[in-house]
């Protein structure tokens, strides 16, 4: 029945799928704690986790759509495969990463919270997970809001949310680099770093150049 399909898409799927993806983020947060130190780490870990999930799910959906087209004899732009490809690959390739990044942000903010704020460190990931489930449910249920519900949710909610998360990740990265630029010269003055290292480590461009140089450099023989 249509009501059962709607319930599955808007309640069961968001809860199960976001919980599964959050479990992967939680494992890294717990067992690779030194590498999970802030908001950017939360965005990256959650984004990669959800991208792998979306890749697998898209293959399943496209495979099922292709099977339907084989049975019905449909082909071209009117086929189920073409429609599925347009909605999942063209219109919403970042849907799953966007949902789970909200969970990752919760873990990221928890990572920078003081250890004495135990309640906050628990509540923030849970809040992120609830937001991820809510956005996922809204997205899955958008088609039930009328003929233009999908496009309304896409333009009013999904696009601004994606832009906000992108801005937050860039801002957080720049903040970390400014902190390095301010603090590392003290270590250089103490002799723990060379004079050039603080500038190199506080610039993404300089880091990239250093990696390229190390990749192509060969010692004299």
Put a short name on every predicted segment.
Residues 1-221:
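Hydrophobic alpha-helical segments at protein termini of multi-pass membrane proteins
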């Amino acid at each position: 029945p249509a009501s059962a399909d709607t319930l599955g898409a808007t309640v069961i799927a968001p809860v199960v799928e976001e919980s599964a993806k959050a479990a992967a983020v939680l494992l890294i947060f717990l067992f690779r704690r030194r590498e999970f130190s802030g908001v950017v780490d939360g965005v990256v870990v959650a984004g990669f986790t959800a991208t792998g999930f979306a890749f697998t799910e898209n293959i399943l959906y496209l495979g099922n759509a292709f099977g339907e087209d084989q049975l019905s004899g449909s082909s071209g732009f009117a086929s189920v495969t073409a429609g599925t490809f347009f909605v999942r690959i063209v219109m919403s390739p970042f849907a799953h990463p966007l949902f789970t990044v909200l969970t990752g942000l919760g873990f990221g903010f928890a990572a920078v919270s003081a250890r004495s704020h135990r309640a906050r460190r628990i509540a923030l990931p849970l809040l992120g997970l609830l937001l991820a489930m809510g956005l996922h449910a809204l997205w899955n249920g958008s088609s039930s809001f009328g003929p233009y519900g999908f496009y309304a949710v896409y333009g009013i909610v999904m696009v601004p949310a994606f832009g906000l998360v992108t801005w937050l990740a860039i801002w957080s990265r720049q903040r970390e680099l400014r902190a390095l630029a301010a603090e590392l010269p003290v270590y250089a003055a103490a002799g723990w770093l060379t004079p050039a290292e603080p500038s190199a480590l506080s610039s993404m461009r300089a880091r990239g150049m250093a990696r390229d140089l190390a990749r192509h450099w060969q010692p004299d023989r």
